C-alpha cells in the first residue's frame, strides 16, 4: 500500500502533466501573414493554397486579400510554430488581438442646421457610403427611414445578409448593407456562441452599433427623445448618406481576425468612410490589425475614423494612433440634464441625471455611505451592500471599477431608494448622465468630497433628489471629457494624437429594441433612442462629417479631408476662453484635444490642406525601427525601397507637430501645403511659442497663384539652453492666415520619449 505522501506526489505529477498537456494543446486563433506573390501556379486561389498548409480545412477561418495578405486559422501552439517554420512564404504569425468598444442637439452645436447650410450638399451626399464596424444594426429604427432616397449608388458591391432574426429585405435605400463576422469570436468562445442573447446575424442586440451608425448618418426623426430628455429632431451628421454595417463586436469583445475580414469586405464593397468606435492597447503598426486594414482603406481613397479610447485622463493612453487614421477624442455639448441633491444641512448639490421614473416626493431620506459587507461597499459593487442598513435610504456610491448603472442596480437590489454617485480623483469634475433604475444623480469630485464629509460628520444626514429635465446653451462648452484618452502617442511620439475632439458626452441617437437603455439584463425598459457617452460617440460624428466633406470635395484624398477637419478646429469654448479639461477643470492641451474641436462649417473651406501620399506614408514607416518585412505587412507590396526614408518620423507632412528633442537642441521639419482656396491667395505665418522653445518659420509668407498649387515651408525648433531633460511637455501653435482663412497647427514639445 502506497504511503499518503507518495500518493499525493503522484496526484501532483499527474495534475501538472494534464495542465501542461492542456496548456500546450489549447487552440487559439492566429493571424498568419503570407508573401502573397509566392502562391504556386498549381493552386487556383490563395484560399486553396492556405488550406493546403493546414492539417484540417476546418481550421481556416478567413482569407484576406485586400486589407491584409494572409489568413487566420484556429491552431494550437505546436501547429502555429510548425506552420511558421514550414515555409519561407509564411512571414509572421501572431495571436488574434481583442479590442473593446469605446463606449439631438449635436448638429445644432456643430452649426449644421442643414448639412453645412449648403442646400445642394444634402442631395450630393446621397452618393456617400459610410461603413460602420460595430455590434450590428437594428434595421427597424426610424433613423434608417429611406423616404425620398434615390437609388443605391452603382458603385456599391455589398449585400444585406440574412441570418438569425434578420431578413435581407430589412435593408433599404438608406441601410444598404449589413454583414456579420464572427469566426474569431466563435473560436475564442469554444467554437460556438456562448451567450443566448447573441444573434448570429447583423442584428444588434447590444445597442452600441445602432447608436454609432445613426450618429454618423441617421435620417432626421422628428419628436425624438430619450424618455422625455433631449426632445427634438434626432439626426445624424450626414443625413442623406448611405449606411453599411459590419458586425464585428460580440459579447466578449471585437476580435482582430473578424475586424480584418470586415475591413477587407468593406473596401471591396465600395464604402467611402469607415467608422470604428473600438480599440485596444498600443502595438507596433505591423501587429495592429486596425492600422493594417486602415492603410489599405486609405490607399483606396477610404477615410478611416477611429475612437481615441476611454482611458483618460491617464497620460499616454490614446489608442488607434496610426497617422493614416483620424483619431477622435470626446468633448461635451452645450446641453445638460441637471439634477440636485437638497441636503439636510440646507446645502444644494448640483449633478446630472437621466432618471425618468417616479420621483422621490417631498420627504428627504437618510443618507448612508460605505455601509456594507465588504471593503468595497463604498463602490457599490455587487453583493457589497448590507440591505439591513441601506434599505429605504439614499446610498452614496464612489464612481469607478464597475459600471455606473450597475451601481444603481446594486443599491436598488439591496433595498435602497436612491443613489448619489460621487466622482473620485480619477474622473474629476466630469459629469456623465445615466438612466438609472432608481432615482439617482451623479456629482463631481469636489461636490462628492463635500457630500462624503457631510455623511460622516452629521448624526442624521438626509437628502432629497430633484430632477430638472433638459437645459440648453450650457456654458462653458465644449469641455474635454475626463474619460477621453490622452497623448502622447507611445508608438510614434513624433505624431501628435489624438487628432481632434468631437461631441461625445450625453449623445442622443438610435437604439436597439433588444435591450434596455442601461444595457443591464434586469432593465426591462425599451426605447427607440438612447443617450450615451464615450469616444465611441465622438468617432461617428467625425465619420459623418468626413462623408459630407467627401460629397462636397470628391477629389480630396482622405489625408486632405483629415487636414481640413484638423486645421480648422477651434480651441476656444463658447465663452471665448481656452478649452478646459473636465478631469480637474484646468486648461486643456493638445495631448487632450489634439488640434481642437471640429468645426464643420470651416472645414468645408480650409484654404490650405496638408496632403499625404501613400509613398510618403511608406517613407514614414521606413524611418521607424521596422524591418522591411514589417513594412511590407502594412503596405502589402512585394517589396519596399527605403532609400528615401525620412530622417525622422516627424518629417511626415502631418497637419500637426509633435517635437521630440530626445537629447537634441534643434529639430527641423519641412511641410508642404496645397491651396484649395481662392486661386490668388497670400498667407502669413503667426507663431505661438512655448517658454522653453524658440520657433522660426521660413518663408514667413506663402503666395499662391492657382488652385492646387503647392508651397513648402521649414520650421526650426530650438530648445533653449538650461532646459532640464524631464518628462514635461510644452505646447504652441503655427498658423497660416489671410482675411478668409486661418490654418492652424498645434505643436507639442517633449524632451524624453515616454
Curated annotation (Swiss-Prot):
The active site is at residues 134, 208, 536. Its EC number is 3.4.21.-. It is an enzyme of class 3 (hydrolase). SUPFAM superfamilies: Subtilisin-like (SSF52743). One of its GO terms (molecular function) is serine-type endopeptidase activity. Glycans are attached at residues 35, 223, 373, 641. GO terms for biological process: proteolysis. Keywords: Autocatalytic cleavage, Glycoprotein, Hydrolase, Protease, Secreted, Serine protease, Signal, Zymogen. Pfam families: fn3_6, Inhibitor_I9, PA, Peptidase_S8. It is found in: Secreted. Residues 367-452 form the PA domain. Residues 98-604 form the Peptidase S8 domain. The keyword Hydrolase applies. Residues 27-102 form a propeptide. Residues 191-215 are annotated as: Disordered. This is Subtilisin-like protease SBT1.8. It comes from Arabidopsis thaliana.
